[in-house]
Amino acid sequence: MSSVLKAFERFTIEQELQDRGEEGSIPPETLKSAVKVFVINTPNPTTRYHMLNFCLRIICSQNARASHRVGALITLFSLPSAGMQNHIRLADRSPEAQIERCEIDGFEPGTYRLIPNARANLTANEIAAYALLADDLPPTINNGTPYVHADVEGQPCDEIEQFLDRCYSVLIQAWVMVCKCMTAYDQPAGSADRRFAKYQQQGRLEARYMLQPEAQRLIQTAIRKSLVVRQYLTFELQLARRQGLLSNRYYAMVGDIGKYIENSGLTAFFLTLKYALGTKWSPLSLAAFTGELTKLRSLMMLYRDLGEQARYLALLEAPQIMDFAPGGYPLIFSYAMGVGTVLDVQMRNYTYARPFLNGYYFQIGVETARRQQGTVDNRVADDLGLTPEQRTEVTQLIDRLARGRGAGIPGGPVNPFVPPVQQQQPAAAYEDIPALEESDDDGDEDGGAGFQNGAQAPAARQGGQNDFRVQPLQDPIQAQLFMPLYPQVSNIPNHQNHQINRIGGMEHQDLLRYNENGDSQQDARGEHGNTFPNNPNQNAQSQVGDWDE
């Protein structure tokens, strides 16, 4: 039987690691489109800045063909290079298009009419057509310019530093559009705005050279539709990853943006590894996970076998990305999502509610994460030299915080927005303290301040120094955190007898049992079955420690 299981494991792994051909193998040729890419051999900043605006206009033109936009994009991303002729050779590796280089000496004054070099393969009709395309912006582009500020195009640019600042400001916006061009291109642009704000703060993006949102959308659409451009950008990302600490501004910028692009489309796979395998909690031993654990093992081996380009499977439209879809390991994916929703607040931004999400295993992950938050990794604890008392203290601290209680502060957790002096007094004001009833399915196994059915929560006594009702509402955040300790179940009718107990530093902390039938009051039982008499004259000390901490 063991041989069959080993054969099954080996078979599962080999399914993922099938022969895909050599890395440099040439696929069967298909029809290729001719793409004209413009090359400027001079470092003249005025000419290059004019070419920058020309490429932006071609991309945004409403009558430009796809090949026109592809050539304009490759030219745009090559403008910072000192040798554009050599840099554009990166695009020659693409089997999707035939790249034609057109050397340009400049533009006619006041127009976007190209002045080709003698070696350029451009006819007079093509030059006139490009000039018309540059002036044919769609009506959705305001002020006849792709920029937000209408006077940006006409500004002189006679210094290399000026050109680089403007060029990098435009290119960084184009790179940000690459981040979501394949995975969530139709989603709201909140993430793009946050990245723009980040690069403005870093000084890499000047706000004056911001493009209009419509121009940014057209750039993203052109990149999404062109595999040639995305293959070219992948080579740029790989070059940026190989750079050392002493790099130029452009590749430092590309390397930074590349962190947002890497492993896009593989989020479910990496989150499953992080929250299912990374936590190493006991539910992984479930027999239902055995087959899917073998699947994850084969996928990790496949990712390593794909090499450096594995990070850009979505950008390259690689078919191998389908192997990493969470539909191939739904149970352990559901468990990992349950763990992640408890441990990571950023999981709220991830759409994990897939049709194959198993609610049962998702709940297993949620409950496991809640129970295991206070556990201590013995190996790490041994490395730190923690004593058993210190390990117990850490566990108790996490348990207290998980129940919504602060570390020794009555009334709630520590609020960083309120000074410590104000935190010593609860800020919530109560008019009526209702009865607190525990649900039948809550066993109160985490050591929280629970009560049996019919037990009433302690309340502040009226008047005196500890009268919480006369305290001003000092902070709404602290009040919101304090109120869940006494959840409102139902209001107590006026004709029924009830009593307000004293808490916090008093000699007696009596828990009353509320009798709905109007009978005489009975002794209440706490969370561990301890009996608390209702007679306030008896000198009985409360054994529910949560109210004393």
From Swiss-Prot:
GO MF term (any one): structural molecule activity
Keyword Transport: no
Entry-linked InterPro entries: Paramyx_ncap
UniProt binding sites for RNA: 180, 195, 260, 350, 354
Keywords, ordered alphabetically: Capsid protein, Helical capsid protein, Host cytoplasm, Phosphoprotein, Ribonucleoprotein, RNA-binding, Viral nucleoprotein, Virion
Biased composition (Acidic residues): 437-447
Biased segments, Low complexity type: 412-428, 452-465
Sequence ranges of Polar residues compositional bias: 531-549
Keyword RNA-binding: yes
Spans annotated as Ntail: 401-549, 405-549
Pfam families the UniProt entry points to: Paramyxo_ncap
Record-listed Phosphoserine modification sites: 439
Compartment(s): Virion; Host cytoplasm
Assembly with partners or alone: Homomultimer; forms the nucleocapsid. Binds to the viral genomic RNA. N0 interacts with the phosphoprotein (via N-terminus); this interaction allows P to chaperon N0 to avoid N polymerization before encapsidation. Interacts (via N-terminus) as N-RNA template with the phosphoprotein (via C-terminus); this interaction positions the polymerase on the template.
Recorded domain comment: Ncore is globular and carries the regions required for self-assembly and RNA-binding. Ntail is an intrinsically disordered monomeric domain in the C-terminus.
Role noted for this protein: Forms the helical nucleocapsid (NC) with 12.71 N subunits per helical turn and a rise of 5.3 Angstrom per N subunit, protecting the genome from nucleases. The encapsidated genomic RNA serves as template for transcription and replication; encapsidation by N is coupled to RNA synthesis. Forms the encapsidation complex with the phosphoprotein protein P. Before encapsidation, the newly synthesized free N protein, so-called N0, is chaperoned by P.
Record-stated family: Belongs to the paramyxoviruses nucleocapsid family.
Protein name: Nucleoprotein
The organism of origin for this protein: Mumps virus genotype B (strain Miyahara vaccine)
